[in-house]
Each structure stands twice: as structure tokens, then as C-alpha cells.
């Protein structure tokens, strides 16, 4: 005997198939109307069944009106090639108007070739493969707190060739993130070969299981198995294991033409219209089959209960069932208007008691990490402060400080820097003031660049007319870079931070700061915790140093500071980090020779000061224990703002090779490194003497 649950399930699967047709039609129309008529069609179509099951199967708790409301489930599209399908679904759900689907990929559109938070409902930017799962894992970590929620992610199987995926897989299992569900679109194709992987990932189920995951392998050419797997994750008892649903399908599944199995293609209009027409015919057949099934259900008893539930399910899918004696049966798609409202502003300022901050004595030396530990004991009392280390917590001081207050917010991912950075982004996207830390050369450029792209899109989405985000919805994410310049000394070139500032200087929106003293570090931390500082790359000294600044010092980004100055100065030495101490010592030596020298600490680039110093007519010495970060900006500013430049008054001392090319540095003691590059106080003093004698 049939029961109501069975009848509802059969009807639900038929409704999902109808929705499948709607989404494929929207996606094809999107390709037809794109500025380049292009689409990653194979991966977009293979993902439709998992997508539709997830968003219309009743397994996600979403607030389309307020996508940033805490406590709702989150979704990350790691395989960015499926953005067209996701955009079709989000337009259908009401995250934005369907008009957004037209003219996609164009300069005027917010719908790009890969997803990003300029598009309503999208939390992060994805595209570089392997990173989305890592961020989704970060969301799952947050979802273990209150209010609790689940984190979903869709990856491709080719994407699993990325090492970062397995960093996240290992760590998610270790952290028992049973609120994390990953759907793998196993379409067995990728860019270079759409019919097979470049190298096969055999025994994928066993691979995930070996890392402690619960794995469900399903036929993703049908809705029943995928929906059952999602319901098992969502509603069955949990035991600490993350869930991976392996969705076995093929590239372009659900399309009619063989062209639909391609990677990124431009579809001729004639073929697109042919494909759309055939999809519409399929929809008509599916709708007719559902309506026959629905009409056969009795109006009372079990059939009546099933009808009522199916009517509610259809409404949730934006489908309208017309049925009754006075009407011909019909099943129409409801084109909803945009529902998403502008997010409420976020107050990002961290609350703390200043009396709890460390008091530094100018007569003593302190390590930056030690000061950070003591400061974080005060800052971390605000639950929005979180830190993530990668097996170098002893050099950052973060874990010891935050862990003293709340160990659950003092995270250490082990030797997995890329995973660390993505987890940090997840926390920052949810409104936390997040800090991640490792040695300067160990930050991942590809990850940092993607995060910065997402940051830019979040700012654009907050500032643009009709944007869905608001003030305070950027990212407050600090990259605490330890052991910069010569601080790693005998560890050798792989650990030496003499080039990181210049490499990362090309990352848009990244605020680079090279701190010189413990009091300055404390002031920089206070500045960051005021909130809305964006992406900050903060370099700190490893070994202890003296205190240069008074307790009331207030850091401002883009400002240099005179540590020594007089009207008699014939030369000004500019430096940052520990180089400032060497410049001060050089100034002492010069004073004994009767030469007055000013000293500037420039932790971040002060363009106005650069111009003022040049216009003063004094000799300028830019001395840096790296490949010339300040010097590169000095040249850039002068050539942009001044027509005639007297280069004879400018002297650069740094770690560039004699021909001006970048180079790496071999192991040596700190004093040996100073001598090697002419950065010892005596050497700098001699350079100054030669400069002023010309």
C-alpha cells in the first residue's frame, strides 16, 4: 500500500526534473546573451543535478532576503566554471533580477566569468582551483559556534588534483567538521581533455574515507540518489565526520547536442536556439507527467496530504500548479523579482580595555611576538577576534595570546599556509577581525591574490548603486609576516624575507607595513582593531628590539615618522624595520664627524613625505634590509610628480645585486649580512660622508 511519504517523494523528484529544465534553459539563454556568447557549458551542465537537488530539495536553510544574516547555511562554488548554472539558480531564487543574466561577462555586468561577491549571495571570489573547499571548511568552523549552521561546497573532480584540496580534507576531518558537506562533480573531464581526467583519481571514495570522511557515491544523472545523499547528510545523526558526496556524471550531461560536452565554448545562436527549444520540449513532457501524477492523487486521505505537501514544495521551487475541475492542468514557472535587500552595516570596531594592554619601558627590549601575545590577551576578549597559525605560532605570538582567552579562536592548521589563509578569509567574510601568520616567504601569492579580488568585489558591492553589501562588509584580515628582511639570518634564502614586500606590492588593496619597534607594533594592532582596515600585510621583527616610540604614539597608514631631525641636517636616512636602528646608529657616528643627519622610519609608504624630502634639497639615503621596497616607491613617486629629478642627491642601499637585479640571500649571521650589503652603521656613515662631499 502506498503511503503519503512515498507519493510525496515521487512527486518531488518530478518537480526537481522540471526545475532542472528551467535552470538549463536559463543557463543557455545566459550564454546566448553573454557579451562573448561564451560559457563553460560542460561543467555548468554536469553540475545542474547536484545544484538543483541542493537548492530546491529542501536541505538548505537560506535567507534570500538577507544573505548575510548569521545562522543560515552557506554555499561555496569551488569549481568556478559552473558559475552560469549558479547564477541561473540565484536569479530564479530572487538574489537578483533575471536581467543580470543578460550581457554577462561584459564590462557593465556584475556577472563575471567566475563567481565573486559583487554578485548578491556570493560570499567569496573563486576561480583559482582548489581554494573554495578550503574556505567552505573555514565557514564550517564558524558554523560549529553559535548560531550553528551547515557549510556546503561544490568542487570538480579535476580540481581534486590541487594539493590545497587535501590540506582542507585532512584538517576538516581532524576538526570533526560534520557540518561540512562537499559535493564532487565527478564528470571525468577537464580543460585539456573533456572526456577523461589528465590523470585519473582512482578509488576516490577510499581516498576521502582514508582521511576520516563519510563518503556517499551516487549516480548524479538522477535526482533520487543525489537528494537521498543530501538528506542523509542533513537529517541523519552526525558522528564528527565531514561528508563527501561523489556525484558520478559526465561533462555536458542533460544537454542534447554533443557540443554541450565541451569546456569553454562559444555557441552559435542557431545551435543555442535549437538546444533551448529541445529543453523546452523536454520540460513540457516532464510537466505533463507530473500533472498526470498530481491529478491522480485523491483529494482526501493520503492523496490529499500528498497534494498539499507537493503544492508547498512547488511554491518553494517557484513553480505554480494549476489544477482543478474548472482549470486545465498547468505548471508554470514563477519569475520572482529580486528579494535580496542591502545588508545592514557591520560595526567592525573591536572592544577592549586599554588598561589591560602591555606597558613598555623604553629602557628595555621586547620581542614583537611577546608584545602581540600580551596585547591579544586584551583584544581577544572581544569574541570577533580570531587567529590562525601554520606551525609558526611561536614566532607570531598570536596563538598564545588569543588562546589565553579562548583556545577555540586560536587556530593552528599545521604546515598548510594556503589552507590557513583561506580559513582566515572565511572568518573575515563573516565579520571577524582575523589574523593569519607565517614566515614572510611562506604566504601563497595565488591565494592572496584571489582573496584581494574578493575583497575588491565586496567593497564594490557595498559602494555601488543597488549593491547588496554595506559598510563593514569588507574583509578585516591581517597577514602577520614574521622574520622579515634579515631576521631569519642563518636559515638561508628559502626563509629570508628580502623580496616579499616587492612581490606582494603588486596585489591590489594590500596595505604593506614594515614595523620597527614593539611600541609601534602595539599601535598598529590598535589601528587594525578599529575595524575596516581591509587587507594588511604586517611585517614584524623576530628578535627583541628596543622601544623607539612613546606610549601615546598613534600609527597612521601612509605616514612616515622623523626619529631624528634638526635644521642643520644635511642628509636624511630613510629605513624601516630593524634598519631604523642601524640608521640611528649611523646618525650617531655622523654626528661625531660633524655631519647632522635626520632619520625617518617609514613603516608604510608616505608619498607626501617622499616629495617633501626630495624638495628639501638634502641628500637622501634609502637604506633597506630587502630588495628596495621603499626605494621602488621613491622612484615611482618622483617620476610621477616631478619633471626634473636630481638623481645625484639620492642613494639607495639594499640587497639588490650590483646590476640592480633582485637576488636571494645565503645563510649568514645578522652582522655578516649587514656587512655584506653595506648596511652596517659604519658603512652607511661612510656612504653619507661620500655623498655630502660631492
What spans do the regions from the language model cover?
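Active-site glycine- and acidic-residue-rich loops that bind
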Residues: 158-165, 222-227, 515-522
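Residues that cap or flank secondary-structure elements
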Residues: 160, 196-197, 367, 415, ...
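Glycine-rich, histidine-containing beta strand-loop boundary motifs that form or position
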Residues: 79, 155, 184-186, 219, ...
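Residue-level preference for nonpolar/small residues embedded in alpha-helices
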Residues: 164, 199-200, 419, 496-499, ...
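Residue-level signal for short, function-critical loop segments
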Residues: 81, 158, 186-188, 391, ...
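Thiamine diphosphate
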Residues: 1-152, 166-533, 544, 662, ...
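Short beta->alpha junction loops/turns
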Residues: 79, 158, 222, 416, ...
Amino acid at each position: 500500500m502506498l503511503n503519503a511519504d512515498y507519493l510525496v517523494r515521487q512527486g518531488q523528484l518530478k518537480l526537481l526534473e522540471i526545475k532542472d529544465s528551467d535552470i538549463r534553459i536559463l543557463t543557455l539563454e545566459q550564454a546566448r546573451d553573454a557579451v562573448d556568447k561564451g560559457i563553460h557549458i560542460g561543467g555548468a551542465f554536469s553540475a545542474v543535478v547536484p545544484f538543483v537537488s541542493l537548492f530546491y530539495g529542501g536541505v538548505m536553510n537560506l535567507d534570500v532576503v538577507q544573505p548575510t544574516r548569521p545562522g543560515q547555511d552557506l554555499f561555496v562554488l569551488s569549481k568556478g566554471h559552473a558559475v552560469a548554472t549558479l547564477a541561473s539558480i540565484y536569479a530564479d531564487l530572487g538574489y537578483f533580477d533575471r536581467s543580470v543574466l543578460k550581457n554577462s561577462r561584459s564590462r557593465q555586468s556584475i556577472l563575471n566569468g567566475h563567481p565573486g561577491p559583487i554578485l548578491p549571495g556570493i560570499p567569496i571570489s573563486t576561480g583559482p582551483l582548489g581554494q573554495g573547499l578550503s574556505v567552505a571548511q573555514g565557514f564550517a568552523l564558524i558554523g560549529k559556534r553559535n548560531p550553528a549552521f551547515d557549510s556546503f561546497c561544490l568542487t570538480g573532480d579535476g580540481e581534486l588534483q590541487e594539493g590545497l584540496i587535501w590540506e582542507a580534507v585532512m584538517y576538516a576531518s581532524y576538526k570533526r567538521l560534520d557540518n561540512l558537506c562537499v559535493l564532487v562533480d565527478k564528470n571525468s573531464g577537464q580543460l585539456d581533455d573533456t572526456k577523461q581526467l589528465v590523470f585519473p583519481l582512482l578509488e576516490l571514495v577510499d581516498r576521502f574515507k582514508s582521511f576520516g570522511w563519510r563518503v556517499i557515491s551516487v549516480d548524479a544523472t538522477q535526482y533520487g540518489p543525489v537528494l537521498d545523499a543530501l538528506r542523509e547528510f542533513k537529517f541523519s545523526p552526525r558522528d564528527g565526520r565531514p561528508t563527501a558526496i561523489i556525484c558520478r556524471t559526465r561533462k555536458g550531461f542533460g544537454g542534447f547536442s554533443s557540443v554541450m560536452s565541451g569546456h569553454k565554448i562559444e555557441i552559435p545562436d542557431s545551435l543555442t536556439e535549437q538546444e533551448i527549444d529541445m529543453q523546452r520540449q523536454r520540460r513540457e513532457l516532464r510537466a505533463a507527467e507530473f500533472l498526470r501524477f498530481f491529478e491522480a492523487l485523491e483529494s482526501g486521505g493520503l492523496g490529499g496530504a500528498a497534494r498539499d505537501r507537493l503544492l508547498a514544495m512547488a511554491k518553494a521551487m517557484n513553480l505554480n500548479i494549476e489544477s482543478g475541475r474548472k482549470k486545465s492542468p498547468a505548471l508554470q514557472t514563477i519569475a520572482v523579482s529580486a528579494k535580496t535587500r542591502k545588508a545592514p552595516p557591520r560595526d567592525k570596531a573591536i572592544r577592549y580595555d586599554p588598561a589591560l594592554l602591555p606597558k613598555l619601558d623604553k629602557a628595555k627590549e621586547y620581542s614583537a611576538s611577546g608584545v602581540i601575545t600580551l596585547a591579544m590577551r586584551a583584544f581577544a576578549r572581544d569574541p570577533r577576534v580570531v587567529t590562525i597559525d601554520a606551525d609558526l605560532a611561536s614566532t607570531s605570538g598570536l596563538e598564545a595570546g588569543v588562546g589565553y582567552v579562548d583556545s577555540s579562536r586560536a587556530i593552528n592548521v599545521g604546515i598548510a599556509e594556503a589552507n590557513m589563509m583561506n580559513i582566515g578569509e572565511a572568518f573575515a567574510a563573516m565579520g571577524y577581525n582575523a589574523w593569519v601568520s607565517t614566515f614572510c616567504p611562506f604566504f601563497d601569492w595565488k591565494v592572496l591574490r584571489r582573496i584581494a579580488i574578493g575583497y575588491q568585489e565586496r567593497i564594490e558591492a557595498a559602494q555601488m548603486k543597488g549593491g547588496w553589501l554595506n559598510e563593514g562588509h569588507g574583509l578585516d584580515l591581517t597577514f602577520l609576516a614574521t622574520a622579515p628582511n634579515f631576521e631569519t639570518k642563518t636559515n638561508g634564502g628559502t626563509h629570508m624575507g628580502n623580496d616579499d614586500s616587492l612581490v606582494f606590492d603588486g596585489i591590489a588593496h594590500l596595505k604593506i607595513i614594515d614595523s620597527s619597534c614593539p611600541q609601534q607594533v602595539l599601535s598598529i594592532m590598535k589601528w587594525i582593531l578599529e575595524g575596516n582596515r581591509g587587507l594588511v600585510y604586517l611585517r614584524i621583527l623576530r628578535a627583541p628590539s628596543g622601544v623607539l616610540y612613546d606610549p601615546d604614539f598613534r600609527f597612521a597608514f601612509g605616514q612616515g615618522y622623523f626619529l631624528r631631525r634638526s635644521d642643520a641636517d644635511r642628509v636624511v636616512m630613510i629605513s624601516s624595520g630593524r634598519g631604523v636602528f642601524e640608521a640611528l646608529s649611523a646618525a650617531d657616528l655622523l654626528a661625531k664627524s660633524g655631519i647632522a643627519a635626520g632619520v625617518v622610519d617609514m613603516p608604510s609608504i608616505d608619498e607626501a613625505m617622499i616629495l617633501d624630502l626630495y624638495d628639501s634639497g638634502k641628500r637622501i639615503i634609502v637604506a633597506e634590509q630587502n630588495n628596495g621596497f621603499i626605494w621602488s616607491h621613491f622612484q615611482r613617486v618622483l617620476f610621477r610628480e616631478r619633471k626634473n629629478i636630481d638623481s645625484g642627491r639620492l642613494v639607495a642601499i639594499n640587497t639588490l645585486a650590483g646590476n640592480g637585479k633582485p637576488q636571494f640571500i645565503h645563510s649568514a649571521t645578522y652582522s655578516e649580512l649587514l656587512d655584506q650589503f653595506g648596511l652596517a652603521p659604519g658603512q652607511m656613515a661612510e656612504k653619507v660622508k661620500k655623498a655630502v662631499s660631492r
